[in-house]
Amino acid sequence: MADITMLILTDHDWFREQFAKLDDLQAQTPVDQRALERVWRPLADKLDVHAYIEEKIFYPQLLKRGTDDAEGETLDAIGDHNDIRDGVRDANAAAIATDEWWAAVGRTRLANDDHMGEEEREGLADFRRHAPIGLREALGRQYREFMAQHPTTKGLSIVDRDPESYVEEQEGATRSPRKDFSLGIGSLKGE
C-alpha cells in the first residue's frame, strides 16, 4: 500500500503532465477547444479535490507530527491552495482558449508549481521523517478512497480558507478539554 506522501507525489506528476498537454494544445493551429476542455476539466477538478483532501487529512496530521516548522508549512500551503482555487475559478469563468482563459490557466499553473515544489521539499519530507509508516499508509488508504469517490468537485465545498484560522481550528481540534486536574502521579497517601 502506498503511503499518502507517495500518492500526493503521484498526483503532482499527473498535474505536470496535464499542464504539458495544455502547452502542446496551445501550440496547435487552429486551437482545438474541445481537446482543451478534455484536458482542463479533469485537471481543474483534480486540483480542487486534491487540495480539499489534503486540507482534510494531510495537513492536520502534519501539524501533529511535523517538527520542521509544520505550522509555517501549513500556513503557506493553505495560502497556495487559495491561489490555485482562485486560478481555477477564473479559468472556469472565462471562455476556453481566450487570452483571459490562458492567463488564468497560467496563474493556476504558477501557483501550483510553486506549491508542489515547496510541499515536496518541506511538508512531505517532514512528514516522511516524523510520521510512522502505518499512519502514512492509513492516510494513503483514506486519500485513495476519497479521490476515487470524487473524480469531480460535485458535492464538495470548494472555498478559500483563511490560513491562520485553519491552523487555529486544527490545533484546537487536537486539544481536548481537561477533565482531570490532578498531577497524574497517583495517590499521595501511600496506597
Can you say where each PLM-predicted feature lies in the sequence?
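Small-residue-biased structural context
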Residues: 1-191
